[in-house]
Amino acid sequence: MHSLIKDLKARNLINNITNEEKLIKALEKNKGIYVGFDPSADSLHLGNYIMIMLLKRFRLYNIKTLALVGGATGMIGDPSGKSAERNLLDKTILEKNIAKIKFQLEKFTNSQVINNYVFYENMTFLDFLRDVGKLININYLLEKEIINSRLSVGISYTEFSYNLLQGYDFLQLYKNDNIAIQAGGSDQWGNITTGIEMIRKNLGDDNIACGLTINLLTNSEGKKFGKSEKGAIYLDENKSTVYEMYQFLINQSDADVEKLLNFLTLIDVEEIKKIMQAHKNNPALRVAQKALAKAVVVDIHGQQKYEQALHISEVLFNGSISTLNQEELEIAIKSLPATKLDKDEIKIIDLLNLANISSSNRIARDFLNTGSILINDIKINDENFLVKKQDAINQKFSIIRKGKRNYFLILWNKD
C-alpha cells in the first residue's frame, strides 16, 4: 500500500475509492489529483479547508495538485445533497466570487488553479450534445442518487446536466493536464464516477482514472463542521475574524477534537495520539483544542495573527480589556452579541434586560448584588446606576462582562 493512502486511512479520511489498484498506479506514475471548488460565495470556509488540506497532503508526497474553480458549473449549481432547485447566481456576482476563490486557492494550496469555464467558453450547445452528451447513457444518470432522489420533486434540465459538466472537467484534465485522480466530499461520488465513465468511453478501458471521496466531517451531534451559531467560519478575515476562528476551534468538544486534528492538520498521526493522551490526562487544560487551534490558525493566517488571537482570548477570559490595543479591541468586539441604543443614558437594570443579559429585574439585581456585572472593566453593584454614552469607549461602545467569560457589546447612537 502506498504510504500516502496508508496515512489517509489512518486518519479515517477516506470514505470510498473507485479503484484502489488504479489509485496506487496513478501515484506511482506521478499522475496528479484535482479537487473542485464551488464559487457560490466570495470566500471559502472551514468546511472547504478539509479539501484544501487534502491537496496539501498530496503535495507532501510530491504529487501534482490542481484546484478547479467552477466558473462554468457554478453558473448551474450542483444538485448533490440538495432537495430543491438552487437559485442561479448573477453573473457579475459569480465573476467576483471566482476571482476571490481563485486567489484563496493559490494562497492556501500552492497548487495550479484553473477556472473550468475555459473548457466551455468556445463550445456551442450542439458541440456539447455531440462531444459530451454522447458519452453518457440517460439510464446511467437516472440510477445516480443525486438525480434519482430529485425525480419525485422535479429537477430542471439545467441541474440534470451538471453531472455531465463535472464529468467532462475530469476528462479534459485527464487528457491535457496529467491528472488521473479526482477527490471530493462523500456527496460527490456520483459526479466523480461520471467523469471516470466518460474517460472510459473516450479513451478505452486501459486508463488509470480513479476517484476518492472524503468522509463528511460532522461533530458528535451529527452537524456539519465549519459553522458557528453566527454562521460559517470563513477563511477571509474580513468575513470572520482570526479571533472568531480561534474561538470556534478552541471550543470544540472533547468528543470531536481528535477527528479534527486528523482531518484539519498535518500533524503526524502518532503525534496526534500523544496529544490526545496528554489531553486525557488533564482535560481541563484543553491541550488537544489548543493544538488544533494553533495548527489551523497559523496555517491560514500566520503566526503573528495567531498570537494576536491568543492574546485577545487570554485578556477577555483572564484579564482586563484596557490592556487591548485599538486594533485588538476592534477585532474582539466583532464577535460579541451587540445591542444598539438610541439614547444617551439608561438604567443598568433596564440595559441588562434589553441586551438579554438577564431575563427579569430580579435576575438583574442578583447579578449586580453578587458582583457579576462589569462595564468596561468597572464592577457595578448599584441597581440605580446610570450607564452613560459619555463614559463609553471612544463614546461609541461599552463592553459588559457577566461573570468570567460572557461578554456583550453596547453600541451607542451616533450624534
From Swiss-Prot:
Is Repeat tagged as a keyword?
A: no
| GO BP of this protein | tyrosyl-tRNA aminoacylation
Q: Which Gene3D superfamilies match?
A: HUPs, RNA-binding S4 domain, Tyrosyl-Transfer RNA Synthetase
| Listed PANTHER family | TYROSINE--TRNA LIGASE, MITOCHONDRIAL, TYROSYL-TRNA SYNTHETASE
Subunit info here reads: Homodimer.
Q: Which CDD domains match?
A: TyrRS_core
Q: What does this protein do?
A: Catalyzes the attachment of tyrosine to tRNA(Tyr) in a two-step reaction: tyrosine is first activated by ATP to form Tyr-AMP and then transferred to the acceptor end of tRNA(Tyr).
This protein is called what?
A: Tyrosine--tRNA ligase
EC annotation?
Answer: 6.1.1.1
Q: Binding positions for ATP?
A: 227
Query: Mind telling me which GO cellular component terms the entry cites?
Result: cytosol
The places in or outside the cell where this protein is found are: Cytoplasm
Record organism: Ureaplasma parvum serovar 3 (strain ATCC 700970)
Main localization, broad class: cytoplasm
Q: Which segment of this protein is annotated as the motif 'HIGH' region? A: 39-48
Q: Which residues form the signal peptide?
A: none
Cystine pairs annotated here are: none
Family in the record: Belongs to the class-I aminoacyl-tRNA synthetase family. TyrS type 1 subfamily.
Tell me the gene name: tyrS
Catalysed reaction(s) here are: tRNA(Tyr) + L-tyrosine + ATP = L-tyrosyl-tRNA(Tyr) + AMP + diphosphate + H(+)
